[in-house]
């Protein structure tokens, strides 16, 4: 019996948090996110379930355990998180982060109303550099995972695929790759050739550059049909030059460097942060 969709709020959440209000945020294949308020705090509750294989999509067993893995990662990073199981998978609860994603924040720029906020770009680079300096890689950088808070700082969310610390075997799984729009060529190539790969700080920087590109322009950095199978998408990322970077000035040149096909030619996240710190 497959779980209903959206995944309901598991009983364990009520025991752990005592909710006073609940709102559905997203419901995707393998994951439902709830905005849960308590008398004192606000939490994001993620409920995972395995994704069965279909003619259009490969199966995704790890989606069921991803919330538990993310909670362990957050705990290793000394961030509050709790997790538990439900009949079809696992769930976690973590602090809610208020604010738009980078893509949402830069929407006025894409319509020509104003230039992108390089303060926000700097905040994203700073958050990634701090993660890298702690010995971790994110593995799933994309605009929706870059939240710009009311104070202008950025938070990296969705850390289920992060690597850098001891995750128990009971909640661990091999790195499956990320949203292909933001995979680096070496990640896509390795997944196509061997089926396995490990994310790196350089692949994170590439993904951040691709996130800057699409958030500033509205275009993916590599061109392929929206409905292309994942293998076709990955082949395009691995073999096709990215679209010309039309973002003007030093920021555009920085994005170009971040999207270098050679990992060693990309700036580090700390170097990206330093460049953006000196922009007007």
Please name every model-derived segment.
Residues 29-68:
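ATP-binding glycine-rich loop module of kinase domains
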Residues 2-39:
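ATP-binding glycine-rich phosphate-binding loop
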Residues 260-271:
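A conserved short helix/loop substructure at the end of the activation segment
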Residues 82-112:
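Conserved structural core of kinase catalytic domains
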Residues 158-163:
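Activation of the activation-loop gatekeeper triad in protein kinase-fold domains
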Residues 132-149:
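Catalytic-loop of the protein kinase fold
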